[in-house]
Amino acid sequence: MAGAVSEARFAGLSLMQLHELLEDDAQLGDMVRGMEEAQTVQLNKEMTLASNRSLAEGNLLYQPQLDAQKARLTQKYQELQVLFEAYQIKKTKLDKQSNNASLETLLALLQAEGAKIEEDTENMAEKFLDGELPLDSFIDVYQSKRKLAHMRRVKVEKLQELVLKGQRHPQAGAPPPPRVPEPSPATALPYPSLEATGLPSVVPRRIPPPPPPVPAGHVATPFAAAMGSGQVSAYPGLQCPPLPPRVGLPSQQGFSAQLVSPYPPALPQRPPPRMAPHQPGFILQ
């Protein structure tokens, strides 16, 4: 609605009037402040400021209580420091006493105090029976002392249990003395079986048998001569026939001279070519 009114207002102005309106800041400010949206924003702003002021005034009412709580917190913190220092001092004293005194000493002292309070209660009961104490004072004092006696008796029993446990634990936890191994005769360790190791069996090498003796008139083999055993293999000596006599030369017995062939050595012959096997349907020529 306000936008339509503004458009209608600006539509009736000429170009010169529009230029003058742009140059006049005061008139533009009045026009903006007169708009409904600007008035709504201003109203919300004033209401927000008023609510903030009221909240601030309400918070100021709690200022005395806040100051009192701060002072109380400071006092409690100082008391805490004092108590902590006292705790540290007492803890140090207790540690020194616990280091100096053992459980047996504490047990003896507590038993002495327990016996003393028991004796006091018995004496009080005798005085009451003799009529030296009135009933009212006897009931109050006797009840408190009997309560203290029972508490000390329970503490003595608990402390005795602790002492017994402390005596048992070191004995149970002490390691046994080391055992000195007795000397034993050195025995050869058996080798593991071949089935357990999975290795193939090794057969020892046999010694070759000696060759048979060579009778007279036989020739020794080169193997026997290389072994140097003095034993030769039995190979019979070769009996070669005598060579035929040549014309004009005397005949000779045995192998006095090396036989020389009058013919040149034969050349090595090439082996014949291999023929393909006979196959049906082909004629070989």
From Swiss-Prot:
Q: The VPS37 C-terminal domain covers which part of the protein?
A: 84-173
Region entry Interaction with IST1: which residue ranges?
Answer: 50-170
Coiled-coil region(s): none
**Record's compositionally biased regions (Pro residues):** 173-184, 206-215, 262-275
Q: Which GO terms describe its cellular component?
A: ESCRT I complex; late endosome membrane; midbody; plasma membrane
Entry's Gene Ontology molecular function annotations: calcium-dependent protein binding
Location in the cell reads: Late endosome membrane
What membrane topology does the UniProt entry give? Peripheral membrane protein
Biased composition range(s): Low complexity: 276-285
Write out the GO biological process terms.
Answer: catabolic process; positive regulation of viral budding via host ESCRT complex; protein transport; viral release from host cell
Instruction: Supply the alphabetized keyword list.
Output: Endosome, Membrane, Protein transport, Transport
Query: Is Transferase among this UniProt entry's keywords?
Result: no
Q: Where is this region: Disordered?
A: 167-215, 242-285
InterPro entries, sorted: ESCRT_assembly_dom, Helix_hairpin_bin_sf, Mod_r
Q: Which PROSITE patterns match?
A: VPS37_C
Tagged with keyword Iron-sulfur: no
Q: In what ranges is there compositional bias, type Polar residues?
A: 250-259
* Role noted for this protein: Component of the ESCRT-I complex, a regulator of vesicular trafficking process. Required for the sorting of endocytic ubiquitinated cargos into multivesicular bodies. May be involved in cell growth and differentiation.
Subunit structure as annotated in this protein's UniProt entry: Component of the ESCRT-I complex (endosomal sorting complex required for transport I) which consists of TSG101, VPS28, a VPS37 protein (VPS37A to -D) and MVB12A or MVB12B in a 1:1:1:1 stoichiometry. Interacts with TSG101, VPS28, MVB12A and MVB12B. Component of the ESCRT-I complex (endosomal sorting complex required for transport I) which consists of TSG101, VPS28, a VPS37 protein (VPS37A to -D) and UBAP1 in a 1:1:1:1 stoichiometry. Interacts with CEP55. Interacts with IST1.
Supply the PANTHER family for this chain.
VACUOLAR PROTEIN SORTING-ASSOCIATED PROTEIN 37, VACUOLAR PROTEIN SORTING-ASSOCIATED PROTEIN 37B
Report the sequence similarity comment from the record.
Belongs to the VPS37 family.
- Supply the name of the protein: Vacuolar protein sorting-associated protein 37B
| Protein source organism | Mus musculus (Mouse)
Lineage of this protein's species?
Eukaryota, Metazoa, Chordata, Craniata, Vertebrata
